[in-house]
């Protein structure tokens, strides 16, 4: 006798080079497919992590390119309207895997038999930031209140979220999923195109090159250390919208030889 699988949808803006996107792919790939029918749907069909989605996971891509102002455009439509336009199938569980736009969309589900989950990955600190993808704070509170459960990736994220939104439904902590065996395996790979100078301090950072990561401050600290006679070399693993601006700063301050962008890498 065939057991009916639980249909789960994960909605996320895209599968770009961020940590949440990678973690979602890890999670979806490793969910028990004998019990769950898993789908990942993106608002934008872009991102380096698309290629890592297993064939056992259904993938639904959205718009083929990202464009500025998309969040503001979505605010013109109600959550219910967006949901009915974007989500075409019926699911037992729908997960908004990032705070913001996808949470607003998923909250528009009107099927009482569908369980809704909101997954929060970052500390948002205040009402203004937390409601940036909504029309206002009241709409954000109304939308998040419709979720049966909210998952936060750490205790501090949970505390931050609850300081902004006072929800009746459960808010729980669930740490990110990692493919530990794959990490151990890749740790044995030899990296041949990067050589560390043993006579200087080598600093490696892994993150998107976006304002929130603070790389502008890191470059200034790097320069000050060099000016103070402390030799060091910084390596950045990642890509992002701020890279060209940061590279200009490095050129203007003659730091190109001691601050290296390595780009996105599988390992």
Language-model segments: what does each one mean?
Residues 247-265:
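Nucleotide-activated donor-binding/catalytic signature segment of Leloir-type glycosyltransferases, i.e.
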């Amino acid at each position: 006798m065939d057991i009916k699988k639980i249909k789960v949808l994960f909605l996320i803006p895209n599968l770009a080079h961020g940590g949440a996107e990678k973690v979602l792919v890890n999670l979806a790939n490793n969910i028990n497919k004998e019990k769950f029918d898993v789908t990942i749907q993106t608002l934008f069909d872009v991102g380096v992590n698309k290629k890592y989605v297993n064939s056992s996971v259904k993938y639904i891509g959205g718009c083929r390119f990202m464009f500025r102002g998309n969040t503001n455009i979505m605010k013109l439509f109600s959550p219910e309207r967006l949901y009915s336009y974007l989500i075409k199938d019926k699911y037992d569980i729908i997960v908004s895997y990032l705070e913001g736009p996808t949470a607003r969309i998923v909250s528009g589900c009107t099927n009482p038999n569908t369980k809704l989950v909101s997954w929060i990955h970052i500390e948002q600190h205040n009402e203004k930031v937390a409601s940036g993808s909504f029309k206002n704070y009241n709409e954000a509170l109304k939308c998040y209140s419709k979720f049966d459960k909210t998952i936060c990736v750490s205790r501090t994220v949970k505390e931050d979220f609850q300081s902004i939104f006072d929800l009746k439904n459960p808010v729980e902590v669930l740490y990110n999923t990692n493919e530990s065996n794959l990490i151990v395996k890749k740790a044995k790979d030899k990296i041949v195109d990067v050589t560390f100078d043993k006579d200087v301090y080598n600093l490696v950072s892994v993150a998107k090159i976006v304002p929130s990561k603070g790389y502008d401050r890191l470059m200034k600290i790097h320069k000050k250390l060099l000016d103070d006679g402390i030799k060091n070399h910084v390596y950045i693993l990642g890509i992002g919208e701020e890279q060209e601006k940061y590279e200009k700063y490095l050129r203007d301050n003659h730091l190109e030889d001691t601050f290296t962008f390595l780009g996105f890498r599988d390992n």
